[in-house]
Amino acid sequence: LIGGTLLLSTLTANGQKKNTQPNILFILCDDMGYGDLGCYGQPFIRTPHIDTMANEGMRFTQAYAGSPVSAPSRASFMTGQHSGHCEVRGNKEYWKNVPIVLYGQNQEYSIVGQHPYDSDHVILPEIMKDNGYTTGMFGKWAGGYEGSRSTPDKRGIDEYYGYICQFQAHLYYPNFLNRYSKALGDTGVVRVVMDENIKYPMYGPDYQKRPQYSADMIHQKALEWLDQQDDQQPFFGILTYTL
């Protein structure tokens, strides 16, 4: 995992001061190595926008992921704990209690998520929320399974759109995504079925006919959330991409 932080202006267009706390956008990417960006010396793939951000800001040369795999690495980021102390130790899958584990039979799916974060320990979005921030997260959660004690709606997130389950996040044309939106009146995390995708099977040659590409949909939801933010209140956003 690699992360970047973007601090935005604290002045309005007419020069009047708004909130004094910086807006923060933190980006996490699965499977992006230290040497995959131009600003860290990668010579073959062009990353001009990220390189510009690095040139205008700061590069971290001794920042390390908490673990080589997804869920425990994210847990270290969220909890601030060393992976040796964190309760999440691997990408353990939790499934619904059904006789046969199914995924991909159109609307029959049983994936629900990973081991939940310990509710006795505060996590980063909760800290930001307690300090007056509006919070949003878009992409992979992997910090609890559906219905567990640790889903975005219970852990300081105001707006969420993406994958609760880290395994499902590697299926780019899924049967469903997860959503939590106070603005839409959600009282908990819900499933949003991809109506166009489920017309085609999850496996085989017809899979390529599925039109709803999750990365684009998640990215668009994040942009919409950013556009909706109030100048008078700081925001903290987490974007988690699966490359």
Predicted regions and their residues:
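Bacterial Sec-dependent N-terminal signal peptides
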Residues: 1-19
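Formylglycine-dependent
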Residues: 90-133, 141-237, 241-243
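Conserved catalytic-core motifs of eukaryotic protein kinase domains, centered on the activation segment
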Residues: 38-39, 88-90
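A generic secondary-structure micro-motif detector
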Residues: 39-40, 64, 113-114
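Active-site-proximal N-terminal segment of extracellular/periplasmic enzymes that hydrolyze or transfer
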Residues: 17-58, 141
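Solvent-exposed loop/turn segments at secondary-structure junctions
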Residues: 31-34, 59, 66-71, 83-84, ...
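Short, structured active-site-proximal loop/turn typified by the sulfatase FGly-forming signature C/S-X-P-X-R
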Residues: 43-75, 80-85, 132-136, 155-164
